[in-house]
Structure formats: C-alpha cells, structure tokens
Amino acid sequence: QEPVNLNVATREQLEQFPFLSDIQIEHLLAYIYIHGQMKTIYELQLVEEMDRQTIQYLLPFVCIKAINNEPAFRWKSLLKSAAKYGKNELLTRFDIPFYRRKGYEHTYLGPSVYNSVKYSFRYSDRLYAGVVAEKDAGEPFGALHNRYGYDYYSFYLLLKDCGRLKALAIGNYRLSFGQGLVISTDYLMGKTIYASSFNNRSGGIKKHSSTDEYNYFRGVAATVSLAKDWDMSGFYSHRSLDGVITDGAITSIYKTGLHRSQKEADKKNLFTMQLTGGNVSYQHNRIRLGITGIYYLFNRPYEPELTGYSKYNLHGNNFYNLGIDYAYRWHRFSFQGETAIGKQGWASLNRLQYSPVQNTQIMLIHRFYSYNYWAMFAHSFGEGSTTQNEQGYYIGMETSPFAYWKFFASFDLFSFPWKKYRVNKPSRGTDGLLQATFTPRSHLSMYLKYRYKRKERDWTGSKGTLTLPIFHHQLRYRLNYSLGDVLSSRTTLDYNHSHSQDRAANIGYQVTQIEAPG
C-alpha cells in the first residue's frame, strides 16, 4: 500500500528487503547519486549487480516518484496529514474446527474456536498505531482467568523519521541491533537459499503487531540522531511472564502463550521482568560501528534445574550483555560481525561476503558461542535455537550464470562443545544444501532442492550410553504458477529418507497441492 520511493530511499529502508545484498544496495544508491532521480522503474535494469529475479522480487514494494525539496519537519503538519491521509484497517480471523478434538472433551476450559482481532492505523512510513486481541483455541472468553474477554491484548504506537527523532515506540515493540548476539527479536530466515538473506542488518526499533505472546518488549524505546553519522537508542521494558514458581523461585519460563487448561492458566503472569539498555552507532560511507548493552532482572530468582545438558543454562536474578558490532565494505568485499560478553561466557559471529562477478556471491560465516554464554534475548545464525554451546564454519554460494536460472549451494560444519538435549556428550554435524531455481516468466517458477544433514543423537533406550549419527536426506520439487490476480497454484513433491548406523531407514513421501485466489 505504501511502496518505497527509490528516489528518496535510505540505506535503512532498502536493508528491510532480505533479497537485496549489501553490494546491490550500494550500487543502487550510487546510481541515483551519480545519475540523479530515476524516471522509470525500468532503470533498475541499468543498475550494476541488479539481476532480473531480484528486480521481480523488488517491484511490488517500490515505486518511482519525482521529488522536490521537502520542507523542514513539523509535528503539526505530520498530525494534520495523518488525520487526513492515514489508513485504517481491521482484520479478524476465526478458526472453527468441523470435528470435536480430544482435548476439548475434558481438559480445556474454553471452546475450540480461535479468534483474533487486529486494528491498525498507518500514515506513510512515519506513523503506526494499533491494537491486537487474541484467544487461542481452547481458551475461555470473558470467563475464568479471561474475565476481560480475550486472553491476550497488545497496543503499539511507532513514530519514524520525525526530525532528529528517528524512531519512538510506546507500548509493545521489538528490538534488534548488530548481529543479534546481545538482543534481537527479529524472525530469522535460517539457512535459506539466498546468500543475501544472511545479512543481519541493524533493525533497531520496530512495532510488535503480531499475536506472538512472548517475543516482544513492553514499555518505551527511542532512537535519536546525535549528529550526521551518529545515532543513539535507549529502551525500557516492564512486563509479566508465564512460568512455574516453586518455593519463591522461578523454576521454568513458559513461552507458548497458551492458557487452555487450568494447569496452563495457573502459570499465567506469575512474575515480572524489567529490561533497560541502549545502543550507540556510527555509520560513515563504508564503515559501521556500534555498541549495545542491556541489563535485565526478574522480581524473583530464576533457579531452573541445572543437570545434564542444562548444567550451564541461565540462572540467577539479574543479568547483562554487552556487544560491539562492526561492518566494512571494500569494492566487492563485505565484512560484518559482532562480539559480545555476558554474565558468563562470550560469543562472536563474523561473516565475509565476496562478489567475484555480477550475479555471483560467496559467503563465509564463522560463529563461536561458548557453552556458558547467557543471552536471553539473543537470536542469530546457527544450527541450534540459541546463541549458546555452538561453533561452526559455513560457506554458501549463489550464482545466476544464465537467464532465468539461479543456483545455490551451501555447506555447514558445526559442533556442540557441551551436551545437548538427547545427546549425552559433545557432538558434531554437517549440513549441505543444493538448489536450482528456474523462473522463465514472472508468473511461473520452479525449483529442485536437495538437503543432506548429519547429526548425532542418543539411541532410544540406551540411557545416554550409545550415541549414533543420524543421516537425513530431503528432496523437494516445487512448481509455482499464477494467473494474474485470479488464481495462484503451488504443487510440491517431497521425499525424505532418514537412517542411522546399522538401523532400518525411515522413508516418507508427500504430495501437496494448494490453490488460492490471486
């Protein structure tokens, strides 16, 4: 609804698109700087490193408009324009099962209907506001522990680019700085088939408008421009969390947000957490530096059971993390990374990207997350779900040597220095991926992907005395076809093969067909 005008787009706006590499962004900004305003969207074909498929991905989100000298920012003008041109949207979702599920016969306290309501207001890319309400299937509505109606409510207000005030969030918001080793509530794409998607950009402050009941902060956050190349961010959050309290201490944190049964409802909002911190960043031409620090504490001590694989997990009452992130671009090379410390341990992630020729990228990533690094809100690249107890080397290559074709290959070698769930000793593994994508038309595309993974796991029934390698082979073919705005079709064929040493293999097949209005 509000495409980005490329003639005035900033680096931060372009970095929101995961399919754009740092080099492509650099060449796009340089093209406009050298040649002046674009007259038509088709000029994207003249930008160095901009391939056909990337342009196709970009077209729905951008536009070309002539610009004049903009007047200085005025709050009165912003509010007046927002009242006149702002857009309102109301969305609701109902999920009604056509059969009686087992859990609703005795266990769950509410009906099997899921319902969410989202109201949002938006003006340009400067003002966002909204309210979210949600009731999961099985949760009561307007009764018992939900006497005020829904089980979850969320409010957010976000202002952006208001003079020196680059961002202001009130209510629920999300944060991401550096490579995510200190704090990141962004959704990562994982080991995807686009090398450009691994470019963790400093996302800063964002609104929280989803129904995720755990992965957000509640309070206030702001980013201010101190000088031309300097920004400073500060934030504070105070919110209740779900969990289990035993003898006055928190023994587990409950992250699902489900309160369907009495047992789940008894865990709701049992303790509070406060968090404060900040970030200072410097960016000039090809260099970017930043420092991020956070401090958070619970109103009760957090004392989970620390045995076996969880021996070095987070515990205590108050915690901190401090990290330095850095990035530098030189010709066809791009280097970025972050190194962080906590109350225990340290972590570091560094990546080097090289584009030897147009439409080809090579990515190298090294990460080291010590087994005793505590970072409750960190979220970064890795095989595991946390930035703890992992180290590895990753290499990926993406190239488009022919028209309509794109090839991707990657290999990841990783290890876990300490025990993990269902692995009673230090372990290691590998992960390889090959993919070929063919896009002959804008409405027709297909790909073939093969993935191989080897990981170690305790054999069932061995009580941790026998650890065997598990081999996974996955093959997928997918065809996407659309008839304009009328119909979109997706056909997927999946084959999975899994086996361990001297054990029988598990084999599975699946055919999926999805038809939806365009």
Give, region by region, the residue ranges found by the protein language model:
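Exposed, low-structure sequence patches enriched in small/polar residues
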Residues: 108-112, 271-304, 311-518
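Outer-membrane beta-barrel proteins
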Residues: 134-152, 206-213, 266-269, 340-342, ...
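Extracellular/periplasm-exposed beta-strand and loop segments of Gram-negative cell-envelope proteins
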Residues: 204-212, 247, 262-270, 275-277, ...
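Solvent-exposed loop segments that connect transmembrane elements
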Residues: 143-145, 194-197, 252, 303-313, ...
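Outer membrane beta-barrel
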Residues: 147-242, 359-376
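Aromatic- and glycine-enriched pocket-lining scaffold segments that form the walls
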Residues: 214-262, 269-281
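Compositionally biased linear targeting/interaction segments
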Residues: 1-141, 145-158, 163, 172-176
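Short loop/turn motifs that connect adjacent beta-strands in outer-membrane beta-barrel proteins
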Residues: 80-87, 126, 162-168, 177, ...
